[in-house]
Amino acid sequence: MRSIKSILGSDLIERETEVGPGTYIRYLDVVVAFLRHLKTVAEAQSHSQLDHVVLGRPVFFVDDDPVRDAKAQAALEFAARAVGFTDVVFQYEPIAAALDFEATTVSEELVLVIDVGGGTSDFSLVRVGPQHRDQLERKNDILANHGVHTAGTDFDRQVELASVLHELGYKAKGPDGQAVPAMTYFDLATWHLINTLYNPVRVNELRLMRYFYADEIYHRRLMKVVTERLGHELAARAEAAKIAVAAGGETTIDLACIEAGLMPTFNEQQLVTVVDQEVQRIVAAARETVRLSGVAVERINTLYFTGGSTGLRLLSNALSECFPSARAVRGDRFASVATGLGIHASRLYGDMACN
């Protein structure tokens, strides 16, 4: 599973997915099972029953749709209560990251929290400082929140299309010179849709597409991936390639599982090219956050980067260029939000909060 919260804001939440021959489960029940596992492990570690929970949430589960956004939070709250939590509190993830950063400050400053994960990019402009640490009510210190449903999985999708799926016929030509249908490749590059390609009806449809290809090697490779259910493996290799070139350089993607000797290369410049639109959308969301606050760009002291996708040099550089007077601070990409949620929980519940 990846970017599991993304399902909350989609129409898929009440739909079912096949988890074995003839066995189906609702996506919402997957979320419930995930939370139940977390609760069980946490209770075993703490040797106590946990009834209260602080859950992080993106600024927007769904872009530009307050009704669906509210439904997404309601679905997550339902899942939390279904596993036994009786008191459920939500906190914006970038606000949680700001609380983590605040623990290190020695003076008051304005920080733009940049939290780019797998499913969403979230931003908060927050006033932080040692004099604020013990305050539970921070409404006046939160100057703006904003976010966009574009992040790491969108990068992965573009990388897979441009590298791995290019070797399977994405943008290949047919006998008439026209490009082969792209929908199959879009589905193969979209994590939660990969399983749909394994449906027997869909597999038969793909077999009939053999004559759509001028070079049948692409069709053979595609059918091997579908019949041997290699879709998620390819997605993981595309993600690994993205990570490998995130700080520069070149990598090789081993696709021997499809065909011996099939090893396309991928480099940072290709990454820059294929994710440009996604990066620009994220940068625009950061700018909009500051605009909503009414604060001059020059007054921002710090950019606090957290979330796994901020490890991409091209993204962090693009964001830093927008705010040249601010220093860049990198938090724990995978734990800042969780640490901040713990801080918030300790302020809400005091001794009841579990370390």
Locate predicted features.
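Phosphate/oxyanion-binding active-site loops and adjacent basic polyanion-contact surfaces
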Residues: R26-L35, Q91, A151-V159, L271, ...
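Phosphate/pyrophosphate-binding loops at sites that engage ATP/ADP/AMP, CoA/4′-phosphopantetheine
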Residues: K39-V53, V283-N301
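Nucleotide/phosphate-binding catalytic cleft detector across ATP-hydrolyzing
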Residues: M1-V113, H132-Q135, R210, A214-P264
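Conserved phosphate-binding/catalytic loops in two-lobed NTP-binding clefts
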Residues: V83-Q91, E298, N317-I343
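Phosphate-binding glycine-rich/basic clefts of nucleotide- and phosphate-handling proteins
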Residues: V128-C257
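Membrane-embedded alpha-helical bundles of multi-pass transporters/translocases
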Residues: M352-A353
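A short acidic Gly-Thr/Ser loop motif
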Residues: P58, V113-D122, A151-G152, A238, ...
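Small-residue (GG/TT-enriched) beta-loop-alpha framework at ligand/catalytic clefts
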Residues: A75-E102, D115-L125, Q131-L161, L165-H166, ...
